[in-house]
């Protein structure tokens, strides 16, 4: 029978209509069309060099593929579910256009290694774009951190006021996280950038192919060195999705803080209206929908990671149809991450800082208590003793409803005669910050140095 399939020759009846739609992937894998064409053109050039195809065949394939690519970009290409996937759609259109030369293109190649090559080309391109968007978000954070290098705010542990930091220093923590994220993506790219083409179905091919030449044409650093592994490996997709999950986790943490800081009870920041929505019933509401949705989408991306792990956990070598299910989680992860990074960079530039609210919060939580303990240690008091002294000082301030810095000197000296008038130099938020003038510290001078260091790194990234 002839069912218009590349493999229909050995079957006695056509595929059931429901099976066609159930097994087809063209509705979502068509996004790989340009990468599939790149791979096919390199394969054709290699086959010509090896003497398998003629120069006439190569010219016809190049011309046909160019026309197909134009049709796809212009939205004129008609995709067919009957042809299953992007690869067979492109091949059928090519054969219709150029005849036998199109039929020869698949020589020495299987859809197994063809698909694996297309995914790697797609993901390599996606990683390069994602790293660029990560850098863009880092730059936006630096733009907000720079004018707030000395803006006092409370640092928290257990969501309780702990010690004074600066808002710039707090933002730099996320710049550091994103820096690691970019490094992970770039490291993942090394393992993505290996060519499976030439592995054929699973055992290689009998044709005199030159895989290293194909790799060179496509910009791959190396070839996959085991044909079984080449067609069945999806580690690179899992690794990418794990790295993407970490990016989303970091942005989810920042989202949680933005939501908290924007709440009227805290009021540290305001987010521009264009990133918020209102309520259909409560006229006063301004809801931080973007950070809330980012927080939700972090779970979505992590779910894709779990889906890919479960997909691969029990597959025998080599290729199995299960692997068709790798694409939707992967594609959605790429889309979600890129959209999130782009919108986040814009949103950070739409944040208004409320320094007075931040400073007021510092003064409400005895944030300089540790500074008083350190002050006593420097006077010769063992730290555990100074800890006890300061704890009793805090109790007194609580009773009087004031900050430690508001206690008169004579009352402070009741706890230790080593306390002198210079203690007030360390009990203010600014005094506390100034003492932490070391690499990684929150002193404004250090914050400015870290901002300059990151700007230099991004300029050379």
From Swiss-Prot:
GO terms for biological process: arginine biosynthetic process via ornithine; L-arginine biosynthetic process. It is an enzyme of class 4 (lyase). It holds the Pfam family ASL_C2. The keyword Ribonucleoprotein does not apply. One of its GO terms (molecular function) is argininosuccinate lyase activity. It catalyses: 2-(N(omega)-L-arginino)succinate = fumarate + L-arginine. Its EC number is 4.3.2.1. GO terms for cellular component: cytosol. Its main location: cytoplasm. Belongs to the lyase 1 family. Argininosuccinate lyase subfamily. This is Argininosuccinate lyase.
């Amino acid at each position: 029978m002839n069912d218009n399939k590349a493999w229909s020759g050995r079957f006695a009846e056509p595929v059931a209509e429901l099976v066609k739609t159930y097994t087809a992937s063209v509705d979502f894998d068509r996004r790989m069309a340009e990468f599939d064409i790149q791979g096919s053109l390199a394969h054709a050039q290699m086959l010509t060099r090896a003497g398998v195809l003629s120069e006439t065949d190569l010219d016809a394939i190049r011309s046909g593929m160019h026309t197909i690519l134009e049709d796809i970009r212009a939205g004129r290409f008609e995709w067919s579910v009957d042809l299953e996937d992007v690869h067979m759609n492109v091949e059928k259109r090519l054969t219709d256009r150029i005849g036998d030369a199109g039929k020869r293109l698949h020589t020495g190649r299987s859809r197994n290694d063809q698909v694996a090559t297309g995914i790697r080309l797609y993901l390599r391109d996606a990683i390069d774009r994602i790293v660029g968007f990560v850098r863009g978000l880092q730059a936006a954070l630096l733009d907000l951190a720079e004018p707030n290098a000395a803006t006092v705010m409370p640092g928290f542990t257990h969501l309780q006021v702990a010690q004074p930091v600066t808002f710039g220093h707090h933002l730099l923590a996320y710049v550091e996280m994103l820096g690691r994220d970019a490094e992970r993506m770039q490291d993942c790219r090394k393992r993505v950038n290996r060519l499976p083409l030439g592995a054929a179905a699973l055992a290689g091919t009998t044709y005199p192919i030159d895989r290293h030449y194909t790799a060179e044409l496509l910009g791959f650093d190396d070839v996959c060195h085991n044909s079984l592994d080449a067609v069945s490996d999806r580690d690179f997709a899992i690794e990418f999705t794990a790295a993407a999950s970490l990016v989303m986790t970091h942005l989810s943490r920042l989202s949680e803080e933005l939501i908290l800081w924007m709440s009227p009870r805290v009021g540290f920041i305001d987010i521009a209206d264009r990133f918020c929505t209102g309520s259909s019933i409560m006229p006063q509401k301004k809801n931080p929908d973007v950070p809330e949705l980012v927080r939700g989408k972090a779970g979505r991306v992590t779910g894709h990671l779990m889906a890919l792990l479960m997909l691969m956990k029990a597959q025998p070598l080599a290729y199995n149809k299960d692997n068709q299910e790798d694409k939707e989680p992967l594609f959605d992860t790429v889309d979600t991450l890129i959209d999130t990074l782009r919108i986040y960079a814009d949103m950070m530039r739409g944040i208004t800082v409320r320094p007075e609210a931040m400073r007021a919060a510092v003064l409400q939580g005895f944030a300089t208590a540790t500074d008083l303990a350190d002050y006593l240690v420097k006077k010769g008091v063992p730290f555990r003793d100074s800890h006890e002294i300061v704890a009793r000082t805090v109790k007194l301030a609580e009773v009087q409803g004031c900050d430690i810095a508001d206690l008169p000197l004579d009352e402070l000296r009741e706890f230790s005669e080593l306390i002198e008038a210079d203690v007030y130099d360390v009990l203010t938020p600014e005094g506390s910050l100034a003492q932490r003038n070391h690499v990684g510290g929150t002193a404004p001078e250090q914050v400015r140095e870290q901002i300059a260091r990151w700007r230099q790194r991004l300029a050379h990234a």
